[in-house]
Amino acid sequence: MFSLSSLSSSGGHSEQKERERISYFDIRINSPYKDIILIQGSPLELSSIPLSGNLVISVKNEIVVKKISLRLVGRFKLEFLQVGRYKKNSSSLASLVKEKRKIFECYWDNLLVSSKGDVLVGGENAENQHNSSSGRSTSNQDMDTSGNAIFLSKRSLSSPVFNKIIRRKTHSSHRKILELPENGVTGTPFEGLRENARSRSSSSNTLNNNSHSYSNRDGSGSSYLFLMKRGNYELPFNTMLPPEVCETIEGLQSGSILYSFEAIIDGRQLWDTDLSVHTSPHGPIGSTSTSGNGMRTKNKIIIKKFKYLRILRTLSMDNLAMQEEISVGNTWRDKLQYETSIPSRAVPIGSTTPVKIKIFPFEKNIRLDRIEMALIQYYAMKDSSAQIYDDEIAVMKITHLADFGPLTDKLDVDCPFTIPDNLKQITQDCCLQDNLIRVMHKLQVRILLQRQVDGEYKNLEIKAQLPMLLFISPHLPMKGRLVLFDKHDGKIHFRPGELVPLFLTTYPAQGLTPGVELNSTTTAHLALPQPPPNYHESTNDHLMPALQPLGADSVVLTVPSYEQAQAQASASSYVTGSVPAYCDDD
């Protein structure tokens, strides 16, 4: 007996079939940094952001596929334990806050037909498209009064009638087959093929965002199958991300925004009697069609690949925060005056910023004990009901001990502070999608002094808070969390205690089966953007000696005096060999 769940299964030996047919399967992003999209500037400074790449497949044995789809999903997650206290008895009450929703989705229905992706969630017109397509799909189903939807609603899903319908539709779904070229292909092999059928299929199923394959009402989706022969395939994909797309947030313990790709090869197993095909001379290049009623399929072969994508944002070069110096100072009457400063409010993650402290004592017997600095990270998150949860933690603390003796004059102290270089320990400053997640930082400085009064030392404490804007810079070494995927449902897991370097420019050559050459799948190594050289290191602008006059390579000219100029003018009037003037005889 058939059941409803058996229709969506991927076959009894899907993993074995996957190893037999596909030797390499990967998603590659066109970016100078591996699996990272780096956006420079704020959403107000940018237009749409291009995203492109290639789906790389190395086919070991021939495989028949219905389509090769790709999906990019961004998910917002809240999960933490909120603890509240009563004032009367100081008892605590804990409640679990948990929420997970999709904030971005882009879908490529079939990369064999089109490389352009459709933004379904998170785009400018995604919500309107979703509502309109949902209305169309609902109306089409209601109008089909003689179809299977209304008929099956009156029957039990486990009834023999239902199983008979399933068996008949499974065995009678005939399609034509298109054969791809030998040794693989680079590009979209059947660009624009049945584009109308593809658009109807994707629009009528926009409601079901959790399904892994879109299809028409008859369950076929398209009337074509594709035969992929042994070889290497590069299928391009591209789309435009909205400028306000949220950044990846992976370091906060209570909330996150994570992006992941999911590529699916929707394979089919053919009946033995339908394995022979013949070439169609009038079809597209490399296409074949079957005789009779076409190809018949019986089982699905689903092959999945997941890829973690980081979308990070950095500051533009003309951001005012880079040139803004932060200084905090105050005066204690009859005691001292102090000033604490950092050269720039914008500090890249993984760098070291100098903290300058100046103390002007107004009386004797004051000495500096130590300087304590702490980097405070404030973060706030908002759930679907607009409830805001905020907290702050000390990301890093350092202490500088000092023994300068009694302060008798101005004291200048330079205390370098190093920002952590991994995105698990610290999160960049951000304000995402109507305060969905907001992160800010400040540097807290405590100056501990001792003042001698009547032979005893009393403690003096100076507190200063310097606002900082922490941003991501690709020019500094940085680390992120190691991501692992559940091979069945694509759930993201972070391996505790392990980090991976970011902003790598090369792809590892792992996963390639020996004997299978990938001729066109090598990703170009793009050079990192370098800052301009210092002036004394310039090679195009040649420096001139300070005492060398302008035009040093030209002949030195001397200016004659007035008498010399008059003598030269009178001598030139008696030059011999000159042509006489014309005179008229009349």
From Swiss-Prot:
UniProt-annotated stretches for the region Disordered: 123-145, 182-217
Alphabetical list of Pfam families matching this protein: Arrestin_C
Residue(s) of cross-link: Glycyl lysine isopeptide (Lys-Gly) (interchain with G-Cter in ubiquitin): 364
GO cellular component: cytoplasm; cytosol; plasma membrane
Entry GO MF terms: protein-macromolecule adaptor activity; ubiquitin protein ligase binding
One GO BP: ubiquitin-dependent endocytosis
UniProt-listed InterPro entries: Arrestin-like_C, Arrestin_C-like, Arrestin_domain-protein
Ranges of compositional bias, category Low complexity: 199-216
Residue runs in coiled coils: none
Biased composition (Polar residues): 126-145
Post-translational modification: Ubiquitinated by RSP5.
Protein keywords: Endocytosis, Isopeptide bond, Ubl conjugation
Described function: May regulate endocytosis by recruiting RSP5 ubiquitin ligase activity to specific plasma membrane proteins in response to extracellular stimuli.
Recorded family membership: Belongs to the arrestin family.
PANTHER family, per database record: ARRESTIN DOMAIN CONTAINING PROTEIN (PTHR11188), ARRESTIN-RELATED TRAFFICKING ADAPTER 5 (PTHR11188:SF62)
Subunit structure: Interacts with RSP5.
Misc. comment: Present with 1970 molecules/cell in log phase SD medium.
UniProt name for this protein: Arrestin-related trafficking adapter 5
UniProt source species: Saccharomyces cerevisiae (strain ATCC 204508 / S288c) (Baker's yeast)
